[in-house]
Design a protein with these regions (language model features):
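Short metal-coordination and nucleic-acid-contact micro-motifs, chiefly zinc-binding Cys/His arrays
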Residues: 52-56, 102-106
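Short cysteine-rich clusters marking metal-coordination/redox-active sites
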Residues: 59-62, 110-113
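C-terminal, charged low-complexity interaction regions
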Residues: 5, 156-247
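Short, intrinsically disordered, charge-biased short linear motifs at domain edges
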Residues: 42-50, 94-100
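Aromatic side chains
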Residues: 25-28, 33-36, 61, 66, ...
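Domain-level detector of nuclease and nuclease-like folds
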Residues: 116-170
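N-terminal accessory alpha/beta regions
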Residues: 1-47
Length: 247
């Protein structure tokens, strides 16, 4: 996500605390809230906004759900708003109204993550998807009975994205079958898969991309993780298999 913007927010500018609720602050706060409500919440703005993120097909918060907008003429009373993902404020507009209009604070989001996050103040605890790196969050696959795996999601530097979006439970409860099926297929043909790994790391990056996508039906490079759900988890699973299952 960080490739979409050249600038970043280094300070939330104004934090709405009780001690800061002066008349001037309230006046400008109301102006920003009205401007967002009347202009940036419109269907035309939503369409322009999502056009910026044409290659972002998966929610940048959870990487679990597709977020592609669908544009059609009005049908059974539905308009663009009903056919698009949510626009999420990383710093909540209820707390940082001056950032409600900042493109650096806006992200496409699945409805699930938007509702979970709600008005939670992310300033000191979470990291924006614009700033996230591949190793900020990692997936571990712990052995259980019957050759199954427990999916564990871990964070670097104590960022709270995992706790906020409940990623640990969601990934394990919802996507365990996906992971366990990959393990099952790998263990059926260990010799063939060892040959695959040996060949894989001797190839060019472009060829690796093609070979990886053919086998795992997902993207190998971090820059492409937003193109398809579960891409980050699948990449971590691939390296777990390389280092632990097919030595």
């Amino acid at each position: 996500m960080k490739s979409f913007l050249d600038s970043k927010i280094t300070s939330p500018l104004v934090h709405r605390l009780d001690s800061e609720k002066t008349l001037n602050f309230k006046k400008y706060q109301k102006k920003f809230e009205d401007l967002y409500k009347n202009e940036l919440s419109s269907s035309s703005f939503k369409k322009s906004f999502f056009n910026i993120f044409t290659d972002v097909n998966a929610c940048p918060y959870c990487n679990r759900n597709f977020i592609n907008p669908i544009y059609k003429a009005k049908q059974l009373g539905k308009d663009y708003k009903k056919w698009s993902p949510d626009i999420e404020h990383f710093y909540p507009k209820s707390i940082y109204p001056f950032l409600s209009l900042s493109i650096s604070n806006l992200l496409p989001s699945c409805t699930f993550c938007n509702k979970i996050k709600s008005n939670y103040d992310t300033y000191e605890t979470c990291k924006s998807p614009y700033e996230m790196k591949d190793n900020d969050i990692s997936f571990k696959f712990l052995p259980l009975d019957n050759q199954k795996r427990l999916i564990s999601v871990e964070s670097k530097n104590n960022i709270k994205n995992i706790e906020l979006f409940n990623l640990d439970d969601l990934y394990h409860d919802v996507h365990s079958n996906y992971v366990n099926n990959i393990f099952l297929n790998i263990n059926k043909n260990p010799i063939e898969n060892r040959k695959y790994l040996k060949k894989f790391f001797s190839l060019s990056l472009d060829t690796q991309d093609k070979l990886y996508k053919k086998k795992f039906c997902n993207y190998y490079q971090e820059r492409d993780f937003n193109k398809q759900p579960l891409s980050k988890m699948t990449k971590d699973l691939f390296f777990h298999i390389k280092e632990n299952e097919l030595k």
